[in-house]
Amino acid sequence: MRVLPATLLVGAATAAVPPFQQILGLPKKGADTLSKPLHDFQEQLKTLSDDARRLWDEVAKHFPDSMDHNPVFSLPKKHTRRPDSHWDHIVRGADVQSVWVTGANGEKEREVDGKLEAYDLRVKTTDPGALGIDPGVKQYTGYLDDNENDKHLFYWFFESRNDPKNDPVVLWLNGGPGCSSLTGLFLELGPSSIDSKIKPVYNDFAWNSNASVIFLDQPVNVGYSYSGSAVSDTVAAGKDVYALLTLFFKQFPEYAKQDFHIAGESYAGHYIPVFASEILSHKKRNINLKSVLIGNGLTDPLTQYDHYRPMACGDGGYPAVLDEASCQSMDNALPRCKSMIESCYNTESSWVCVPASIYCNNALIGPYQRTGQNVYDVRGKCEDESNLCYKGMGYVSEYLNKREVREAVGAEVDGYDSCNFDINRNFLFHGDWMKPYHRLVPGLLEQIPVLIYAGDADFICNWLGNKAWSEALEWPGQKEYASAELEDLVIEQNEHQGKKIGQIKSHGNFTFMRLYGGGHMVPMDQPEASLEFFNRWIGGEWF
C-alpha cells in the first residue's frame, strides 16, 4: 500500500474545484481529457446530503491543507502501438467465445464463461539471452487489449526453472494501488534483481524456482500498461484479469492443466479477494485456481486501522517510533476513525468512504510518516523519498526505462514509472480504499485455501492488523481458527533446517504467517524464508 501525503489530502465538499487549476501549461488535448471528470465531480458535490456535507466539512476542519488538493484524473501515457506482425501470437477473445461444446446432458454451451469478445491477447516469445535475465528459461511478454475501452495491460511470464510441465503457475500482483508488478519482479521475487550499476543480477531465491510466474502491470496506466480511459476501483480491474488468464491459458494449454495460484502484497489485499471471486464465479473456465496468498495486505480496514497505534508505539515486537503524546493523539482519533469506516462499510458510498480514508490516514498514519521513519519497515529511516524509501526501486525504474529493455519486451509506452500516483488518488476518490473486501474471503474459503502472511517489521500493513482481521473474520471455522495458537515456522528444505523464520497458525482452509525480520516486501527482506514458505504452500503442506 503506497501512501504519500498528497494521496491523503483532498478538498472538502464545499470547496469548488477551480477550473483546470491542476493542468496549467498542459496542451489543450490534456485539458479536454480532464474536463468531463472534473465537471462530473463538481456536479456530484452539489448532490450531497447535509450529513455527507458535514462529514466532508469536518475532515476539512481537521486537515485544512486538504483544501489545496483536488481530485487528479490520470492522463493517458504516451505510447506507440506495435504492428500485429511484431507478435508471435494474437488470441482473439471473440474466437474463444465462439467455441461451443456439448454439455453432460447433451446441451450446447460455451467452452468458457465470461464476456471476452472485446479482448485480445498479444504474445511475444522473449529471448532470455537478450537481457540476461534467467537465460535458458522460456519467457513471454505482451499485452491484454480491451478494445472496447482502449485498455492495454502488460504482462511478463517466466517458466519454472525446475519442472515446467508439472510445476504450478502463479500470478503475482503488486499493490499501490497504482504500482507496477515489475517492482515485485526485480526488487523481490523475480529471477533477477537490478544492482546499482543498473545490471540484472541472478536471484537464487526466485519464486520461479519451482513455479511458472506471471507478473501483471495492472490496473491500466501502471508500469508498461496504458489506456485512454481509467480504472478507479478494484472490481473493475477483476474482469481484465479473468480475461487475461483465460486467453493466456487458451494459447498455452500446457500450463492450463497445472495448479494455479494468485499471490500479491499490499493493496493486493483488495485485489485478490475480488479477482479470485471473479474466477470462481465462472463455472466453465480453464483456470485451475487452487489457492491465494496475500502478503502484508490491506483487506479489512476497520480491524486493521486499530493496530497502527500499537505498531508505532512499541507493541509489535520492535521499539516505539512515536512519543507518548503522539500515541495518545492516535488513541484519541481512533473512535472517530472507526465510526467513519463503519459508515463506509454500511453504505459503500464514495461520499462516505472517501472522508474515512482522508481522516483515518491523516490521523493514524500521518504521525508516523512525519517522523521520517520508513513506513514499510519500522527498523530504519526512509532512505530515498523519491523512490518510496528504497534506492533499489530507482534502479529498477532506470533499467525498465532503457530503450533496449523496452524494445526487448515489446513495451509500447514511452517511459516506465514504478508507481502512478494519479491512479492511487483515483482509487481513493472512488472510495475503494476503505471498502470491506474481506467480506469476499469466506466465499473463497468454501472453495480454496487462503494464506495471509506478513513481515513483522512493516508498519503500513502490519502483522498485528493482519492477524487481527483474520481472527475476526466470520466464517464457519472462525472459532477454531481464532483460538489456534501461533507455532514456530522453521526451515525444512535446505542446509538451514530448523532455523526459525516466523510463526504460523492454521485451521481448515485459512492460514496466517508472521515472518520474522520482513518489512512490507517480505521476499526482498527475507528471500530464503520467503521461498521456503512459498514452495511449501504451493506444495500443499497446509491444505
From Swiss-Prot:
SUPFAM superfamilies tied to this protein: alpha/beta-Hydrolases (SSF53474)
Keyword Transport in record: no
UniProt-listed Enzyme Commission number(s): 3.4.16.5
Pfam families reported in the protein's UniProt record: Carbpep_Y_N, Peptidase_S10
Superkingdom of source: Eukaryota
Catalytic residue list: S266, D458, H520
Keyword Disulfide bond attached: yes
Biological processes per GO annotation: proteolysis
Main location: other
Location of this chain's protein in the cell: Vacuole
PROSITE patterns xrefs: CARBOXYPEPT_SER_SER (PS00131)
GO cellular component: fungal-type vacuole
Signal sequence segment: 1-17
Catalyses which reaction(s): Release of a C-terminal amino acid with broad specificity
UniProt GO MF annotations: serine-type carboxypeptidase activity
UniProt xrefs under Gene3D superfamilies: 1.10.287.410, alpha/beta hydrolase (3.40.50.1820)
Protein name listed in UniProt: Carboxypeptidase Y homolog A
